[in-house]
Amino acid sequence: MPDAVLQLHPLRALIYRLFCLLALGWLAGCAVPFDRDARLSVDVPTRAFVPDVPLIEQEAFFCGPASLAMVMQWAGSDVTQDDIAALAFSPGAGGTYLADMIGSARRSGQLAMTLHNYDDLLAEIAAGHPVIVFQNLGLGFAPVWHYGVVTAYDFDRDAVFLNSGQQDQMVMPFALFDRTWARGDYWGLVVLPPDRLPASGSEIEILQAAAALERVDAFAAAAVLYQTGAARWPDSWLWYFGLGNARYAQGDLRGARQALSRARSIAPDVPEVRANLAQVRSEL
Amino acid sequence: MGILNLTKRGVAIALSAQLVLATQAVTMAQAEMLGTEAAINKYAQHSDRSFLMGELQREDVRAEIVALGVDPAEAEARLAALSDAEVASILAQMEKDNAGADIIGILFTVFIVLLVTDILCLTRFFNFTRCVR
């Protein structure tokens, strides 16, 4: 995965759109058609659309923060691209690193999980979740790194719709989108409030995203996500174990005891559950 | 002599006490909560299995298996019979061989098919698979 940095030159804000159009036109000319059957191993609807994702015009260099702000505002937050930039942007690099996209979303108390293929990307859109994608809008030897938010697709119209940090929505044919996304190593990011689960990703990936919230001290968000996961996978003790730990970290000993007791009733023999339950009881 | 014996004894007692304490410290003396992340990493194996089972449900994988004359239900039963450690080592090998490749989907299919064919004595790709015939 490239630790790449994106975004345009400061004085190129105007040229950017023009260059984009040029690059897109050129690439579209030689693009191989997108083979839906070969690229997808799951059934997805012919078209899907995520309503109400705001269009935020990015400030210079801020396509990463602007993308995160769009997705988080869509979910009801009032965070701005400047708020996110303070957590994510690297001024020396003139852009936002992939890892900082994930980290800043988590430090803002959001579930953040990466995806890497069309199955997952389109499944998320079909489930009503916008997805941030990392693209190279230029060429391999002359990269124009960019983050955009995929909000819709339509196979009949051969179109992928992106909120791309400009005033208007960006529409790309699938083949062209594929080329720009392939040059970004098919890096996509789902960012959701912790009371919603992504459509893609295994139970373990979502558990790890929840544990990562604990790591950045977003314990309240972690607790909500553990509860959401426990409702979806009621037979899995790890959700209750995490819930107990997140509640303990917030000083909620009774809540922690309740969650850990639940974990123990599901998995009576796990030493970690017994140890933490004993610890909580000793402090009550 | 007496002193030497005493010293030896003292050292022996001190050492064994330390040993006992050290082993107990792991199980007993715990001053803080054990982390969620470590538990996920330690106990995630059962889900590795469900991941492989999920891969077996894929159309392209099933088609390959059927083309080899294998009943997919039998393939699932065989996969269920592998130990957690064996499942983990399949996934570790997949990850190693997939590193840097863009054709993950194809490689995964190949791995799953090889796993099944291994178990059915048609191939021997994974070193731990037991041939049933």
Feature annotation, model-predicted:
Chain A
Residues M1-C30:
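Sec-dependent bacterial lipoprotein signal peptides
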Residues P2, M101-S104, Y248:
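Short, charged, low-hydrophobicity "junction" segments
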Residues A13, L22, M70, F177, ...:
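Acidic, low-complexity intrinsically disordered regions
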Residues W26-A28, E59, H146:
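Generic detector of short, well-ordered, non-transmembrane alpha-helical segments enriched
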Residues C30-G94, L137-L139, E203-I206, A210, ...:
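Active-site-adjacent structural segments surrounding the nucleophilic cysteine of cysteine proteases
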Residues A31-P54, M72-W74, D83-G201:
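Conserved active-site-adjacent core of cysteine acyl-enzyme catalytic domains
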